[in-house]
Amino acid sequence: MKLTVLALAAMMGVGGMAASVQAAEVPEGPHVVTSGTASVDAVPDMATLTFQVNASAKDAAVAKSQVDQRVAKYFDFLKRNGIDPQDISAANLYTMPEYEYQKDGKSQLKGYRAVRTVQVTLRQLDKLNSLLDGALKANLNEIRSVELGVAKPEVYRDKARQMAIRNAISQAESLAQGFGVTLGPVYSVRYHVSNFQPEPETRMYAAAPSANQTSAAQTYEQQTIHFDDRVEVVFNLSK
């Protein structure tokens, strides 16, 4: 938990603090401005897997058929592994011509390439390695990304927000007490709306001391996701 106190209004002069106070609409009388920030850590409980499959053929329909067959094979694999069909998306498809360029600079149609993207929402992280292996066995050419996340991010967002609020209040109370004045009511609040893009912190899995060989699952990285928030509050002061 982190908290930064900007300053007492009487101490604020120029630069970023002055602009910050103006944005927060400070009163003419004695007041104090605090900026509360908080960070909440969450352990991922889900992952979004993105794969790409592509195939080339003389005919566009043949290339599409090859891609569709690979995707269908992976769909069957996912169903056998208990993945809800609603957590699978592969509706997008595009085809493009492929050209072969001659030494004289001219191009000749070589064939067509079909591409589909498959996205899977995985809610059981212990199946992560299995689903990655299954995709490669189904000839899905590319593993584009593996993004870890949490199923209910709003819970962590709200917790971070409430912690930032409490810290802003706590700092204001501490400052008022230290300067021998009474903390009055809130005059204004400036909330720094966050995009809430969790920042991952990498932690390597540790192999068991007695293990002679590291398992494949242990080579993947576990993340701690940080949800940060900030609120700026102006309080009135009285003697």
Swiss-Prot record:
GO terms for biological process: DNA damage response. InterPro entries: 26kDa_periplasmic_antigen, SIMPL/DUF541. It comes from the Bacteria. This is Uncharacterized protein YggE.
